[in-house]
Amino acid sequence: MTAFAVAPVFAAGAASAQDVADTPPWPPVATFSILGYDPETGEIGGAVQSRVFSVGNGVLWGEAGVGMVATQAIVDVSYGPQGLDLLELGYSPEVVVQTILAADPDPDPERWTVEGRQFSVMDAEGNVATHTGTRSSAWAGTSSARTSRRRATFWPVPR
């Protein structure tokens, strides 16, 4: 089985062996999501893991024959439905990402900034585009590959 996958990753606050003794202002938060496409069957899917309770209603969005969207970090849940609507209109994932970002009103630039948003868009053919804002966290990133083996693993590289 070959698969296309993109894994956006977010962690609130930097983490390293040297920081273990430091006490963060709140417990560390991390969310990992993955979108996948199987070219043999045309199936798409996604999964999310998070320390944040009950993220399922705000991270993954999908529609058969259209695609999937994963939103995390400083989330605007409207990105999911917007992304699916634009994909259904025939826009490429790259144009979807650009269009959504350009239309974001950035209502609270100090605390809830568009620069903290992170999301991925995948169409029904496995084409993908991602965005990781410069203020999403000290350790955040994405990784994608056109094909992966079942046992292959990959980890995003911290910026």
Summary of predicted features, one role per range:
Residues 11-19:
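Boundary at the C-terminal end of the N-terminal hydrophobic targeting segment
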Residues 18-131, 135-159:
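Alpha/propeptide regions of enzymes that mature by internal proteolysis
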